[in-house]
């Protein structure tokens, strides 16, 4: 199927009323390729956006008793490196399909000794160390200043922590993710400096993905699966490699999938316990 949402571009910076009844989904997941294989009644949907093509087709199916849209942020063949992902197109596609909650799992490195590989961190803050990424939908003519003080939905974070604990996973209930530009990994000096600031994890995709989702008044939660200690943490830690990240992530993928399914099962239909749906109420001049 194919949807043309280019004609809807003029809603910015106005309120939107985009509804796609036939293929609507309640929850969206940005993640690695392959997760859609666990869907019931999976269907591939093409979405054209005002910002160009998303990373891939969107997979829509049933998971945890709810309609879920899944988009592999790097593409199904991992062809889009983190600094080249069309984040605006990806987020727009989810909004266009009626998604109101975004779950954003990712692989991440640990910057602190107590955050061990194999554990999960439900981040509550980010630090943006990227450069040149387009990170807003609001380029005028109406000035719109969306707060990033609390970048992740408090209600979804609580539900994610509970879901992980119910699955027997070691969960860190909060943490700061420092987002680097990529595709290179950090130098030891950079990694050591990040850790000295007290930041817990390091990743390449959480910004601007999460903030753009918030700009469109969607709830967003990050679940970081820790794959390695970053290079500046221990003197005897070998520099991180992509192969190592993939190996550890794959070993823990079953835990992540079980946790996400349980999280989805417990997400309520109504958004009554957060302010995410009213993000723009105080953002405009």
Predicted regions and their residues:
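Zn-dependent metallopeptidase/amidohydrolase metal-coordination segment
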Residues: 204-242
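Metabolite-binding pocket within alpha/beta catalytic cores that recognizes anionic/polar moieties
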Residues: 2-4, 8-149
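Generic hydrophobic/aromatic pocket-lining and core-packing "Φ" positions
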Residues: 91, 191, 207-210
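Short acidic/polar active-site loop segments enriched in Thr and Asp
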Residues: 100-101, 200, 219
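Active-site rim beta-loop-alpha module in soluble metabolic enzymes
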Residues: 151-196
